[in-house]
């Protein structure tokens, strides 16, 4: 009776075991820091990989987390595969007016933007975490951010032996995300270790 009831309601059981687990997401869709619709992406990945690959045998569980910004509230880097929204700033120094109180430097939580006295703004790319808060800070358009891209972490783990996932070397576009996730799952199926 229970199985027929949940089938009528479009639900499935069995979210445990050596398979793709239900996809988790932060509230980036409604969060002030969220850079994209995390719920929509999580739903898409959940349908394609949790529901669509439900019978795919894996050597161990495979967890996917979808994070809306570099705050990492859902801890994507501690999952088998984690996605983090990124907005990479493009600095146009020709538009910088060297304002006494640089709005970009004021809003940057990483202190990646600085204004040496009497000079134009300097952006330290190594300090920038691509949170996008600076995107519209400069009233003269010296800094802008393009479309949201995604940092992909692979191989993260939480528990007795913690491992921070390794970020892929390049950010990926939205349309590339499902293919990247699929390749990671298939690689894990072929070469992953049990336990």
Language-model region placement:
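Cysteine-rich micro-motifs
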Residues: 128, 132
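Short beta-strand elements
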Residues: 80-85, 150-157
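A generic structural motif
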Residues: 1, 30-33, 87-89, 119, ...
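Iron-sulfur cluster-binding cysteine motifs and their immediate structural context
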Residues: 101-123, 133-149
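Active-site lining segments that contact anionic ligands and/or coordinate catalytic metals
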Residues: 78, 140, 147-149, 163-167
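Small-residue-enriched alpha-helical segments and adjacent helix-cap loops
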Residues: 1-101, 107, 127
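Generic secondary-structure signature for well-ordered alpha-helical cores
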Residues: 4-7, 11, 47-54, 109-113, ...
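A hydrophobic, small-residue-rich beta->alpha segment in the mid-to-C-terminal subdomain
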Residues: 156-195
């Amino acid at each position: 009776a229970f199985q027929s009831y949940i089938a009528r309601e479009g639900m499935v059981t069995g979210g445990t075991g050596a398979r793709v687990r239900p996809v988790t997401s932060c509230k980036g869709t409604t969060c002030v820091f969220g850079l994209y619709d995390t719920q929509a992406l999580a739903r898409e990945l959940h349908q394609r990989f949790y529901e669509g690959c439900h019978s795919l045998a894996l050597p161990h569980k495979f967890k996917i987390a979808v994070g809306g910004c570099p705050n990492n509230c859902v801890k994507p880097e501690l999952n088998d595969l984690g996605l983090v929204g990124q907005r990479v700033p493009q600095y146009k120094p020709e538009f910088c007016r060297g304002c006494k109180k640089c709005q970009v430097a004021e809003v940057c939580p990483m202190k990646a933007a600085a204004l040496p006295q009497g000079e134009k703004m300097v952006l330290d790319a190594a300090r920038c975490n691509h949170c996008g808060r600076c995107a519209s800070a400069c009233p003269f358009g010296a800094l802008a951010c393009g479309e949201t891209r995604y940092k992909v972490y692979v191989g993260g783990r939480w528990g007795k032996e913690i491992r921070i996932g390794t970020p892929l070397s390049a950010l990926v576009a939205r349309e590339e995300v499902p293919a990247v996730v699929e390749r990671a799952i298939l690689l894990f199926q072929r070469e992953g270790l049990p336990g």
